[in-house]
From Swiss-Prot:
PANTHER family documented for this protein: INTERFERON ALPHA-5, TYPE I INTERFERON
Gene name tied to this protein: Ifna2
Matching PROSITE patterns: INTERFERON_A_B_D
Protein name: Interferon alpha-2
Pfam families (UniProt xref): Interferon
Domain of life from the UniProt record: Eukaryota
Signal peptide: 1-23
Cellular component terms (Gene Ontology): extracellular space
UniProt KW keywords: Antiviral defense, Cytokine, Disulfide bond, Glycoprotein, Secreted, Signal
Length: 190
């Protein structure tokens, strides 16, 4: 009987260890994929940014709001996922495909899609984790409003090449800033 109990305990420990080893290594994978996506996004530049200064606009990226909210891991992952999804939606639109080099656009969108898969895997592992809904909802709403402002801007500018260049630079800034949420993920993992 003692051997059976020891064997069962060992199985439980091993299965728990294997589940944890399959766990969410998001800071590392997200950072690598994000760097690759940013590199491709930089390569997508078609116009000198200085030639589009008259089209510049402050879209009010909600990073300040996100930073001030002391977002925990359970909240950071949905915010990163929404930021990535909204970026993917923007760059997979019909108007976007006309504005960019198809090879670079496909590469960028593939990187975003891989990031979404990583984020979704981590979200699935958080099932049952209680998260403060108000803070998370505020951050998600801020991200959605930010992308709505970008979409309205593109529509008002009739998806001009300069408008897309301004948006490309803005999205580059947003994705670059998103890595600021990663230390929170690393801290909670330890």
């Amino acid at each position: 009987m003692a051997r059976l109990c020891a064997f069962l305990v060992m199985l439980i420990v091993m299965s728990y260890w294997s589940i944890c080893s399959l766990g969410c290594d998001l800071p590392h994978t997200y950072n690598l994929r994000n760097k690759r996506a940013l590199k491709v996004l930089a390569q997508m530049r078609r116009l000198p940014f200085l030639s589009c200064l008259k089209d510049r606009q402050d879209f009010g990226f909600p990073l300040e709001k996100v930073d001030n909210q002391q977002i925990q891991k359970a909240q950071a992952i949905p915010v990163l996922r929404d930021l990535t999804q909204q970026t993917l939606n923007l760059f997979t639109s019909k108007a976007s495909s006309a504005a960019w080099n198809a090879t670079l656009l496909d590469s960028f969108c593939n990187d975003l899609h891989q990031q979404l898969n990583d984020l979704q895997t981590c979200l699935m592992q958080q099932v049952g984790v209680q998260e403060p809904p108000l803070t998370q909802e505020d951050a998600l709403l801020a991200v959605r409003k930010y992308f709505h402002r970008i979409t309205v801007y593109l529509r008002e500018k009739k998806h001009s090449p300069c408008a897309w260049e301004v948006v490309r630079a803005e999205v580059w800034r947003a994705l670059s800033s998103s890595v600021n949420l990663l230390p929170r993920l690393s801290e909670e993992k330890e």
